Amino acid sequence: SDRLVGSEMCIRDRYNLLSNDQNYHFSYEILKEVGLSSNKIFNAFKSFRGLEFRQQIIFSDKRKLIINDSKSTNYHSLIAALKKYKDIILICGGQIKSNNISILDDSLGNIKKVIIIGEESNTFHKYFQSKVTTVYVQSLDKAVVEMSKFMKTNTDFNTFLFSPGAASFDQYNNFEERGRHFNKLISKLSK
């Protein structure tokens, strides 16, 4: 039987592949069942670029990886991102959907710094302040400025992860608008 080998596929790079491995295997089995050839399936997988704002890689080089996970609107999606990356500078915050922030406890090992934005920043600040370096900046614009400062003063590899873990309605109409704003701010950094 055909085997799906992760190294044969790529939606953008290996980071996204890791989070989608189960989805690929499931999709592969369904598509084989309806009669598509392995070759057609693999070609489709290779050309698939993933969905916007779902751990979307915005930029990557030897020193940094910038990820837009604006779809992260609750703690569970934030946990998924935190467990996946290392050397994280996290931008989080917004309107919290749950008071049970302690469910993040087992997911903090890879965080170097937290930049907090949004309406309910006190909850995030109280939670993170004794665990990791935190800074509160209110807006996404200011968070990206803070991120840029960190980039300029730090030569180690870092993952800059925008994974709010909260809803966007305090400052945006939806997570898509918030995600587009983040991408726009990042594109200005390179100019």
Per-range role (PLM):
Residues 16-111:
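Nucleotide phosphate-binding/pyrophosphate-handling subdomain across enzymes
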Residues 90, 114, 162, 178:
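Hydrophobic, well-ordered secondary-structure elements that form the walls
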